[in-house]
Each structure stands twice: as structure tokens, then as C-alpha cells.
């Protein structure tokens, strides 16, 4: 039986990464679970991640590199794991590209959709958990945590557009998305996550 593919999404500071390993541990009771991330997840993908997070580049180049890293990730990690019957949890996937490069940067969504179709050949997550927080909350969580990368250092307006695009995508695909109110406590969020994963 083919495995299931779960993605965690949200703007920087939403707190999604805090819960990934917790969810993975819950799911390991019923399947082998592979945790991974984007950009990254493969040796080439991790090299591209460093370029994407720290080097200035044209907006189109940024989007193309995101999808190049994703193609490698799908071919080397995601598809083989799903074919084995493993479950895959990824810290970000294509929704992040639509949110950050489409919403935040303003790249045409139809161009991103063309790349998505080419690179993914129809692959979509079975479940996307969108951790949603107001900008003030996200900024407070990031303040002083570490040296910000290129995206974390973006403007408030950038993150407003990014968040708006995330929520638009969630509204367009309610069968796939579950929006998590990430202003709640860790314990409250985990109660909600427990209820969601019980339905898988």
C-alpha cells in the first residue's frame, strides 16, 4: 500500500517546525515515517537551500531553483518512500513556493502552476497542515532567535502577502488543508493535531 504524504506550512515564526517530530512519533506507531524539508532533503537540495536562503538572485531564478530542488527531492526521497509504503512528512512543499515566490515576491501564479505540473506530475500531499499566526506573533517569535536568512529579513508587507496567499490556497483546497491556529499553546495545538492525524 502506498504511503501518505503530509506537509507542514506557514510563514516564518508560525511555529510549525516545533510539531513535526512530535507528529512523526505519533505516526510511527502505524508506519515507517520519513521526515524531510524544503528546500533541501537531498545533498543537492541542501546545497541549493544555502544559495536560496543567503544569495541575492533574480526572482525567476529563485523560483526555478526551488523547483529544481523539489524535483530532486521528489525523485530521490519522496516518491521512493511513498512507493515503499512509508509516510513522508515534509517541512514545506509547493504551497510555500506559491506563498513566498507568488504571494510575497509577486511572481505570476500561472507560471508557478506550470512548473508545478511539470516537476510534480500530479503529486500532491494527502494532508497539508497550515500553521497560521498574525504577523505580530511571528515577528515576536523570530526576534533575536538567530541571524535571519534572506526570507526572514523581508518586510512586513512581504509576509502579509505570503500569509494571504497561504490562506487563499487553503480556502481553494479545503479537502487537503487543515488550518491550525498557531497562536494557541503547544499543548492546545497538539490536541488539535492529535484529532487530525486520528482521521488519516
UniProtKB/Swiss-Prot annotation:
Family: Belongs to the thymidylate kinase family.
Organism: Cupriavidus metallidurans (strain ATCC 43123 / DSM 2839 / NBRC 102507 / CH34) (Ralstonia metallidurans)
Taxonomic placement: Bacteria, Pseudomonadati, Pseudomonadota, Betaproteobacteria, Burkholderiales
Catalytic reaction annotation: dTMP + ATP = dTDP + ADP
EC number(s) stated in the UniProt entry for this protein: 2.7.4.9
GO BP terms, alphabetized: dTDP biosynthetic process; dTTP biosynthetic process; dUDP biosynthetic process
Binding-site positions, ATP: 10-17
First and last residue of the signal peptide: none
UniProt GO cellular component terms: cytosol
GO function term, MF aspect, one: ATP binding
Function: Phosphorylation of dTMP to form dTDP in both de novo and salvage pathways of dTTP synthesis.
InterPro entries found in the cross-reference section: P-loop_NTPase, Thymidylate_kin-like_dom, Thymidylate_kinase
Keywords: ATP-binding, Kinase, Nucleotide biosynthesis, Nucleotide-binding, Transferase
Protein name as it appears in the record: Thymidylate kinase
Amino acid at each position: 500500500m502506498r504511503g501518505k504524504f503530509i506537509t507542514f506550512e506557514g510563514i516564518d515564526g508560525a511555529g510549525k517546525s516545533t510539531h513535526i517530530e512530535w507528529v512523526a512519533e505519533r505516526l510511527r506507531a502505524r508506519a515507517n515515517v520519513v521526515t524531510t524539508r524544503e528546500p533541501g532533503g537531498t545533498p543537492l537540495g541542501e546545497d541549493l537551500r544555502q544559495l536560496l536562503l543567503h544569495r541575492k538572485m533574480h526572482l525567476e531564478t529563485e523560483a526555478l531553483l526551488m523547483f529544481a530542488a523539489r524535483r530532486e527531492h521528489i525523485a530521490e526521497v519522496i516518491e521512493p518512500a511513498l512507493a515503499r509504503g512509508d509516510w513522508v512528512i515534509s517541512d514545506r512543499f509547493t504551497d510555500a513556493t506559491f506563498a513566498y515566490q507568488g504571494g510575497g515576491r509577486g511572481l505570476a501564479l500561472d507560471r508557478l502552476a506550470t512548473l508545478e505540473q511539470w516537476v510534480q506530475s500530479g503529486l500532491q500531499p494527502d494532508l497539508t497542515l497550515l500553521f497560521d499566526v498574525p504577523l505580530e506573533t511571528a515577528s515576536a517569535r523570530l526576534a533575536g532567535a538567530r541571524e535571519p536568512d534572506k526570507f526572514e529579513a523581508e518586510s512586513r508587507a512581504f509576509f502579509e502577502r505570503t500569509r494571504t496567499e497561504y490562506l487563499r490556497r487553503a480556502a481553494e483546497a479545503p479537502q487537503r488543508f487543515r488550518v491550525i491556529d498557531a497562536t494557541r499553546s503547544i499543548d492546545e495545538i497538539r490536541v488539535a493535531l492529535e484529532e487530525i492525524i486520528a482521521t488519516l
